[in-house]
């Protein structure tokens, strides 16, 4: 049976200066989106070698070196839909699946994207940043739940221009890290996913 994803609930923040669908906070350093835009409200975080395009409703897509040629996760050029190749999902003890980004409050600043969420039996935040050097994207999640729950990071690997050759992606696990490579990619290399808990 297909999994039904619920939306997370919003944590409303009061802007210091209201503009459009939200406003500025933290002395003008950050912009909070307090309502649902009709189209995805996008934000780019990047270094010279790596980047990610996120929105108010999704973790978007990521790329290395060139956003067209070496997409790590898929990108869709449909402005009415969002890029959903990366997601943060909470599975509750009663079997519900909640997309913690979709429906949350998005806060964008030049160096990070933060999502604040709450709902029945859970609350927390997710902070996304890109390292200045190297090819690294970090997602820090703080979450409180009333009962045991599982936190999942969903990614749809692409490793190239399009998903056309995604069946050629080879997975490997080494020292608790998921490594992915593709013989069809124009640029040879690895994509790795790892998780740590504090």
Residue ranges and their predicted role:
Residues 1-198:
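Anionic coordination/interaction segments
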């Amino acid at each position: 049976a297909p999994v039904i994803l619920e939306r997370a609930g919003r944590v409303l923040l009061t802007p210091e200066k209201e503009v459009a669908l939200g406003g500025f906070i933290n002395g003008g350093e950050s912009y909070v989106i307090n309502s649902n835009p009709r189209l995805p409200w996008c934000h780019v975080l990047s270094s010279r070698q790596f980047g990610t395009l996120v929105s108010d409703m999704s973790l978007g897509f990521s790329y290395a070196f060139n956003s067209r040629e070496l997409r790590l996760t898929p990108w869709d050029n449909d402005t009415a839909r969002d890029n959903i190749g990366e997601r943060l999902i909470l599975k509750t003890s009663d079997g519900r699946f909640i997309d913690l980004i979709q429906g949350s409050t998005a806060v964008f600043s030049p160096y990070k994207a933060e999502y604040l969420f709450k709902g029945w039996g859970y609350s927390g935040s997710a902070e996304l940043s890109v390292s200045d050097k190297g090819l690294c994207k970090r997602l820090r999640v703080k979450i409180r739940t009333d009962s045991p729950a599982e936190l999942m990071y969903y990614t749809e690997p692409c490793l190239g221009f399009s998903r056309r050759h995604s069946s050629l992606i080879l997975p490997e696990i080494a020292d608790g890290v998921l490594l992915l490579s593709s013989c069809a990619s124009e640029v040879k290399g690895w994509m790795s996913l790892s998780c740590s808990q504090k």
